[in-house]
């Protein structure tokens, strides 16, 4: 019962390679959660051995550029090539479109409105798009229920619950649904 590792281990539980570096990642960053999204995209690009170029929303250029600088500097201190993290500093729609269609761009991570996500999907490059949504969280039967409730409340309240990644709905594994509901009621009493 519960979560199983499917597709991660092979015969005799030997690890199988499941990915390889792709090249340059185009990271399109919104204004609604600019720093956390920039950090997340930089980390997943670098952890997967890819370079990343961020294209910030015009109203968040300064904070995204500073976040990219801080992340790049921290990485360089640990041996990251200095050009592995880049950020467009004069953001405009044309720059984002050029980045998405550039011959060196291998994959696009687009976070923003539906128009931006559609543009990423129609760029001719592999793209992962995230737009506005009703974000669910799944609590599995083996979870520490008290910790799960604390984490859900923390995530829901982060940045006043305004980011598209904030938990908006909870889906509970049937065996723990009642206990989860009771813990939530207990934790949210004023």
For the regions a protein language model found, what residue spans apply to each?
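Single conserved hydrophobic/aromatic residue that forms the stacking wall/gate
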Residues: 1-14, 186-190
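A structured beta-alpha segment of the ubiquitous adenosine-cofactor-binding alpha/beta core
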Residues: 15-17, 86-105
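Conserved small-residue-rich beta-alpha loop and adjacent elements
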Residues: 17-73, 78, 114, 123-127, ...
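General beta-strand structural signal in soluble alpha/beta enzymes
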Residues: 36, 54, 86-89, 109-112, ...
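ALDH superfamily catalytic-core signature
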Residues: 39, 44-47, 117-189
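Short acidic loop-to-helix transition motifs that present clustered carboxylates
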Residues: 90-94, 114-116, 134
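Active-site/ligand-binding-proximal alpha/beta "capping" segment
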Residues: 96-107, 113-118, 122, 150
């Amino acid at each position: 019962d519960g979560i199983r590792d499917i597709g991660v281990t092979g015969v005799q539980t030997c690890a199988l390679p499941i990915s390889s570096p792709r090249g340059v990642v185009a990271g399109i960053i919104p204004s609604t959660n600019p720093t956390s999204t920039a950090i997340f995209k930089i980390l997943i690009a670098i952890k997967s051995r890819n370079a990343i170029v961020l294209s910030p929303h015009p109203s968040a250029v300064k904070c995204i550029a500073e976040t990219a600088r801080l992340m790049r500097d921290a990485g360089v201190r640990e041996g990251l090539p200095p050009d592995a993290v880049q950020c467009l500093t004069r953001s405009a729609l044309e720059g984002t479109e050029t980045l998405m269609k550039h011959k060196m761009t291998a994959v696009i991570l687009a976070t923003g409105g539906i128009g931006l996500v559609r543009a990423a999907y129609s760029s001719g490059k592999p793209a992962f798009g995230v737009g506005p949504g009703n974000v669910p969280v799944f609590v599995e039967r083996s979870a520490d229920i008290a910790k799960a409730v604390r984490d859900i409340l923390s995530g829901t309240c982060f940045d006043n619950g305004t980011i598209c990644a904030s938990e908006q709905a909870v889906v509970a594994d049937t065996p723990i649904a009642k206990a989860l509901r009771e813990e939530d009621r207990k934790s949210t009493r004023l």
